Amino acid sequence: MKIGVFDSGVGGFSVLKSLLKAQLFDEIIYYGDSARVPYGTKDSATIKQFSLEALDFFKPHEIELLIVACNTASALALETMQKHSKIPIVGVIEPSILAIKQHVKDKNTPILVLGTKATIRSSAYDNALKQQGYLNVSHLATSLFVPLIEENVLEGELLETCMRYYFAPLKIFPEVIILGCTHFPLIAQKIESYFVEHFALSTPPLLIHSGDAIVEYLQQKYALKKNVYAFPKIEFHASGDVIWLEQQAKEWLKL
């Protein structure tokens, strides 16, 4: 099965990594709109337009399924993309909510949603969680993480300063953290360590990773089996510097 994976930049690598590990597909076309990253600071109309242009990119490739590996595009443009497409298009929000339902049974569990300004402003996660009966949901726009990750700043004082800026004011410890941007799993261990150290925790918070969630979702929805395609063909495309994107993929995905 030939599929496409679309993200605003390198954040979709976290989803791609989970897909490669699961070995669900034999061919993957990855498109990163790196010339216009980040999406999270842009308005809804612009995000929809960029997402439709990404959809146009995939048409000559004759893919059978498209994964929108961008929370901002999933929150604001998924329905628009689906209306303009004859193939199935899957976002990352619904799979993450299903993962919450599977792993978090107590509806009063404190849940923190991290995301870009656009994703948080859309209330997509908040509304979906409330529809499932979760009552203790808070959110935090952490958009500054995106440019840091795009520049491969995955550790060090700059990242620590950024985490302190966002997390130090928190008064309630979240038992569950939704990484509501596909860039964020690339610093998941740092986020987990911050909460363990600064909240003096014996048990780290449960991090919901959209990459792992979407693998479970695809298996259930399309009856896909793991470990079928050990060496899928992967093509990388970008609106910006594709050589840079390929270099980042080799480093982060160990290709």
Swiss-Prot record:
SUPFAM superfamilies per UniProt: Aspartate/glutamate racemase
Keyword flag Transit peptide: no
UniProt enzyme class: isomerase
Metabolic or biological pathway, per its Swiss-Prot or TrEMBL entry: Cell wall biogenesis; peptidoglycan biosynthesis
Keywords annotated in UniProt: Cell shape, Cell wall biogenesis/degradation, Isomerase, Peptidoglycan synthesis
Matches recorded under PROSITE patterns: ASP_GLU_RACEMASE_1, ASP_GLU_RACEMASE_2
Enzyme Commission designation: 5.1.1.3
Source organism superkingdom: Bacteria
Binding site for substrate: 7-8, 39-40, 71-72, 182-183
Molecular function, one GO term: glutamate racemase activity
Reaction equation(s) it catalyzes: L-glutamate = D-glutamate
Key word rRNA processing present: no
Alphabetical GO biological process terms: cell wall organization; peptidoglycan biosynthetic process; regulation of cell shape
Active site: 70, 181
Family per record: Belongs to the aspartate/glutamate racemases family.
Role played: Provides the (R)-glutamate required for cell wall biosynthesis.
UniProt-listed PANTHER family: GLUTAMATE RACEMASE
Protein name: Glutamate racemase
Gene name as annotated: murI
